[in-house]
Amino acid sequence: MQLQFRSWMLAALTLLVVFLIFADISEIEEEIGNSGGRGTIRSAVNSLHSKSNRAEVVINGSSLPAVADRSNESLKHSIQPASSKWRHNQTLSLRIRKQILKFLDAEKDISVLKGTLKPGDIIHYIFDRDSTMNVSQNLYELLPRTSPLKNKHFQTCAIVGNSGVLLNSGCGQEIDTHSFVIRCNLAPVQEYARDVGLKTDLVTMNPSVIQRAFEDLVNATWREKLLQRLHGLNGSILWIPAFMARGGKERVEWVNALILKHHVNVRTAYPSLRLLHAVRGYWLTNKVHIKRPTTGLLMYTLATRFCNQIYLYGFWPFPLDQNQNPVKYHYYDSLKYGYTSQASPHTMPLEFKALKSLHEQGALKLTVGQCDGAT
């Protein structure tokens, strides 16, 4: 009788998880504003569910609080200066890693592998689900044969966001001391080395960066600028989300063609079709009600798999710093962004609050001011 009762309880919990995940995916569908075919998203959900038991990030013995605050009230949640005591909580870090592994495995999900696709294969875009792309010969040639993170493990990892809070931080030297450095969206480093460092082991490149930072490669000058940036990576992993939306197809192909034509020394990676929904599912089941995870949150979630200690820099989604000084959205350009806009696909202040909670518990270290030794 006791065994039968346990079976019924397990079945009920399983149905609850399925219901919650499908509700979350329906929410994504409404945000994107598309209608029609659901095959691709449903298959991503099924894949996610196959790895997920409902797990919670433990903060002070309980799960992360559900947070809906999108105002600049989050500025009140200040971070202590770099010189303040911070101690790594290894027990919590390991627990988070195990929980995330129930949703995704960064070693596998960081990239689709060559053996899983062939030229001409049809892929449904993650967000434009009624649109498809064919795997091109160039894309196929650049798919890795094995995971670029296979059997990799690092003592310390730095994830460098792009907030203007990095300016005058003097964090460059500290960032470069870490075992593995992750950067976002091909952000420039040479001219900002004192504040952001130079070392790069993995850098992401959303297709929109080609439009915004390299003028859609409209002429030879812009193509040369992109080539210089790519050559500067010098063997790093270039992580290109090629399967997100239809609008990025041409830009991904342009970059792939340049890499092959000029024999650029990079290791390309193209994230799995299930990764984004798996990451979102993990945070949602921990009561962090994000919309679409930012690149920074994606990178943190992946890094828990292969990094013992994780240090975040340049994560600050507010227009003012802790001293009420203006902060640029990006340290390297004049782009404006509505952090609390309902139209934004991201919920950056909410993500920050979750990361700050983890910082306070020692699961990661979040630096938002000057680094030790900065002058």
Curated annotation (Swiss-Prot):
UniProt pathway? Protein modification; protein glycosylation
Topology check: give the Lumenal ranges.
24-375
Q: Does the keyword Cell cycle apply?
A: no
Active site residues according to the UniProt entry = H346
**All ranges on the Cytoplasmic side of the membrane:** 1-6
For this protein, what is the EC number? 2.4.3.-
> Which compartments is it annotated to reside in?
Golgi apparatus membrane; Secreted; Cell membrane
SS bond list = C157-C307, C171-C371
Q: Which residues cross the membrane?
A: 7-23
Q: Which CDD domains match?
A: GT29_ST8SIA2
Q: Which residues form the signal peptide?
A: none
Keywords from UniProt, A to Z, are:
Cell membrane, Disulfide bond, Glycoprotein, Glycosyltransferase, Golgi apparatus, Membrane, Nucleotide-binding, Secreted, Signal-anchor, Transferase, Transmembrane, Transmembrane helix
Q: Name one GO molecular function term.
A: sialyltransferase activity
Q: Tissue-wise, where is it found?
A: Expressed only in newborn brain.
Give the UniProt entry's GO cellular component terms: cytosol; early endosome; extracellular region; Golgi apparatus; Golgi membrane; nucleoplasm; perinuclear region of cytoplasm; plasma membrane
| Entry annotated with the keyword Secreted | yes
Q: Which reaction does it catalyse?
A: [N-acetyl-alpha-D-neuraminosyl-(2->8)](n) + CMP-N-acetyl-beta-neuraminate = [N-acetyl-alpha-D-neuraminosyl-(2->8)](n+1) + CMP + H(+)
Provide the function of this protein.
Catalyzes the transfer of a sialic acid from a CMP-linked sialic acid donor onto a terminal alpha-2,3-, alpha-2,6-, or alpha-2,8-linked sialic acid of an N-linked glycan acceptor through alpha-2,8-linkages. Therefore, participates in polysialic acid synthesis on various sialylated N-acetyllactosaminyl oligosaccharides (alpha-2,3-, alpha-2,6-, or alpha-2,8-linked sialic acid), including NCAM1, NCAM1 N-glycans, FETUB N-glycans, and to a lesser extent sialylparagloboside (SPG) and AHSG, which does not require the initial addition of an alpha 2,8-sialic acid.
Q: Please give the PANTHER family that the UniProt record associates with this protein.
A: ALPHA-2,8-SIALYLTRANSFERASE, ALPHA-2,8-SIALYLTRANSFERASE 8B
To which protein family does this belong?
A: Belongs to the glycosyltransferase 29 family.
Q: What is this protein called?
A: Alpha-2,8-sialyltransferase 8B
The source organism is: Rattus norvegicus
The lineage is:
Eukaryota, Metazoa, Chordata, Craniata, Vertebrata
Which gene is the coding source of this polypeptide chain?
Answer: St8sia2
